[in-house]
Amino acid sequence: MPAYDLTAPYTPKGDQPTAIKQLVQGVNGGERYQTLLGATGTGKTFTMANVIAQTGRPALVLAHNKTLAAQLCNELREFFPENAVEYFISYYDYYQPEAYVPVSDTYIAKTASINEEIDMLRHSATRSLFERRDVIVVASISCIYGLGIPSEYLKAAVKFEVGETLNIRSQLRELVNNQYSRNDTEIARGRFRMKGDVLEIGPAYEDRLVRIELFGDEVEAIRYVDPTTGEILQSLETVNIYPAKHFVTPKDRLDSAIGEIRQELRDRLDFLNGEGKLLEAQRLEQRTKYDLEMLGQVGYCNGVENYARHLAGREEGTPPECLIDYFPKDWLLIVDESHVTCSQLQAMYNGDQARKKVLIEHGFRLPSAADNRPLKGEEFWEKAHQTVFVSATPGNWELEVSGGEVAQQVIRPTGVLDPIVEVRPTTGQVDDLLGEIRDRASKQQRVLVTTLTKRMAEDLTDYLAENEVRVRYLHSEIHSIERIEIIQDLRLGEYDVLVGVNLLREGLDLPEVSLVAILDADKEGFLRAERSLIQTIGRAARHVEGVALLYADNMTESMAKAISETERRRKIQQTYNEKHGIVPTAAGKKASNSILSFLELSRKLKQDGPDADLVQVAGKAAQALEEDPDAGLALEALPELIDQLEGKMKEAAKKLDFEDAANLRDRIKQLRQKMAG
């Protein structure tokens, strides 16, 4: 068992010890599926950390978005400072997939912007999985996409060892084959340089350089050095340099793949010509032959991932190898917020196939492109060795496959109880809510209000503002950084009320919130389903005076179940507190965030500097551009305008509105050209 070193300033409390013991026994006993039903604020991440430490397995912690994955990674790194806690998410800052819109006969080429730091973290994760067992990888759903062939990636690693005799030309050739480029002037990640008897390499998975010092053909020393100062950071006896890309194809496999692609092209052209689809056949032949020429000459082409099945030597319909294939056989999967994450697994495959089908039918891609895909839900679960689902509201499927293996964790270390739930009539609900808000604001407490529609949220925000309530409105068009800033301002008391339609997805853990108001709670639907109601009620579960108000004229089944579950948890918590003499205390979570530290500096510069009004200028410029793309714009407004348009472009791509995203991309290019002069 690897030595996970769990470091924490506290020990398990409440029902954490029982939950930890039950889950550890289940994992060690071979249980394939278990569920941790943990209420908001009960320390589920700490319980996860204890289960990982006590079972000693390499672990994958799966989150349903990048932000939650980052939060989990930071927390687990604090718990395991001496172990490998890695972060694996999509490395695209912006990604617009290849698409074709038949209605308007519009082809949109793939456009992507890769974040080099995230790419480094992805390589760091796979390197750690090859070299040690005390590894925790926190990943988003992107981990179900193809990631090369682990065995080929490992086989391609170039090893250096102190005292060995090298054929240095052969080693340099291997580095080039592994997609490292030689640059004797400027060394960086994915590059190497050779000066005299010193070889320096920028590994794909490190922000440090590896320096190989030679004496003739013998390796005299291996060191990690700082790329900026040249300072020696660590001496090594041996080092493996893994490929700069996860997709590694040996020469013999590449030659076979080219032959297979040619044969598939012939078969597909026969089919298309037989169907009378001459334009599609001509298009496919031209595109594929160009790609084959590039593959034969340089081993790469744009869109090479569409030939992944042939390059990997897979059979038609077989699943791709992905991050989880880099884990050893006895790995442990922990699915955070499983009621959301599990449903995403199947959705990713379905969306991908719908887009690929159109490209294949219209001659843009060979049928084998459909096998460049994420895993199907069932394929993912076949690969999962043992799983712990974690949620305050586990889904029916998780509970079903877990059988009776459900560990309950409802007691908070702070002693805080679940909120009191009150149902009030909708007649006069806004005025009633206004009175509650004023009462909470007078005590320096915060309020969350959730409505059913965007229009209702806007109208309510306007009404509250007219009545001198400090209120903000959170909606889908607000960009990620601004969302974080709005939430931070609520915690800091810049305003008292946050109104939104779906506040669940924000992962809002706000100790200052003492009141959650749910308008139209009796309107059945996704936002008023049992699990959604429990999640929303839980937003007030970190405050000693937490209350949830449900405005409704009828008691729906979802409401009844949510209220019953909240009361059940509250009774358990109350009984525990009375038995152990615990007095509920407020959670002491500080309102700090590294991202927001940057925002504070940015805000100060805007207030103090000569460009304080740039944001307003850019806002007007954006509006003018929408009305008249050729409108004259001040150069100083362009950077902020480009940021706004990039945000819109990313939102359009997320919504699969590829035409709009492409138009925005073209506008941004024009603006950048204007800036360049």
UniProtKB/Swiss-Prot annotation:
PROSITE patterns: HELICASE_ATP_BIND_1 (PS51192), HELICASE_CTER (PS51194), UVR (PS50151). This is UvrABC system protein B. ATP binds at residues 38-45. Residues 639-674 form the UVR domain. One of its GO terms (molecular function) is excinuclease ABC activity. The UvrABC repair system catalyzes the recognition and processing of DNA lesions. A damage recognition complex composed of 2 UvrA and 2 UvrB subunits scans DNA for abnormalities. Upon binding of the UvrA(2)B(2) complex to a putative damaged site, the DNA wraps around one UvrB monomer. DNA wrap is dependent on ATP binding by UvrB and probably causes local melting of the DNA helix, facilitating insertion of UvrB beta-hairpin between the DNA strands. Then UvrB probes one DNA strand for the presence of a lesion. GO terms for cellular component: cytoplasm; excinuclease repair complex. Keywords: ATP-binding, Cytoplasm, DNA damage, DNA excision, DNA repair, Excision nuclease, Nucleotide-binding, SOS response. Its main location: cytoplasm. Forms a heterotetramer with UvrA during the search for lesions. Interacts with UvrC in an incision complex. GO terms for biological process: nucleotide-excision repair; SOS response. Belongs to the UvrB family. Residues 25-412 form the Helicase ATP-binding domain. The beta-hairpin motif is involved in DNA binding. It comes from Parasynechococcus marenigrum (strain WH8102). Residues 429-591 form the Helicase C-terminal domain. InterPro entries: Helicase/UvrB_N, Helicase_ATP-bd, Helicase_C-like, P-loop_NTPase, UVR_dom, UVR_dom_sf, UvrB, UvrB_inter. A motif (Beta-hairpin) lies at residues 91-114. It is found in: Cytoplasm.
